[in-house]
Amino acid sequence: MILLDTNVLGRMTDAADPQCAVARRAVHSLLASHDRPVVVPQGFYEFWTVATRKAGSPPGGQNGLGMTPDQASQWLGFFQRRFTLLPDREELLPRWHDLVRRLGITGIRSYDARLVAAMQSYGIDRLLTFNAEHFRRFPITIVAPASFEAVGE
């Protein structure tokens, strides 16, 4: 199993993003190799937040995808059909708390620690993400979407 980070989901949905094809290629490669891409509820919450924020950079935009709630909901349905959604387990909170205390995690990085805690609760050690730097301090294997080569390259 490999967890898909929220940024992979977001880029898969945004054809205008230069990394859209990279994200889709990585996920298709995982599926073709019978690897099991999985998602956790936090990824859906974060996707909804980004997807339904106003597109564009501040001050006019909010760094979002500019989707309507119906569009974001359709994508969530697609993700649920395509990937395995692993529910949060009871041990998530104590695992998260241990990580943030032991590694000295503060601020917004505590959300990254929660993803890692969810991974640990399922014995998952690989994360597909465009934000490798956010996860370097955690005891996981970071997989870059760009590591999946395009056919013919």
Q: Over which residues does each language-model region extend?
A:
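Metal-dependent nucleic-acid phosphoesterase active-site entry motif
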Residues: 1-20
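Glycine-rich, phosphate-binding/catalytic loops in enzymes
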Residues: 20-22, 144-145
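Acidic, PIN/NYN-like endoribonuclease modules and their adjacent C-terminal/linker elements
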Residues: 1, 113-153
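Hydrophobic (often cysteine-bearing) scaffold residues that line and stabilize catalytic clefts
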Residues: 19, 111-112
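Alpha-helix/helix-capping structural signal
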Residues: 7-8, 42, 114, 133
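Short, locally clustered residues in the helix-turn-helix/winged-helix DNA-binding domain
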Residues: 13-14, 52, 120
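Short helix-capping/linker segments at secondary-structure and domain boundaries
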Residues: 18, 55-59, 123-127
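PIN-domain endoribonuclease scaffold, especially VapC-family toxins
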Residues: 2, 24-38, 42-108, 117, ...
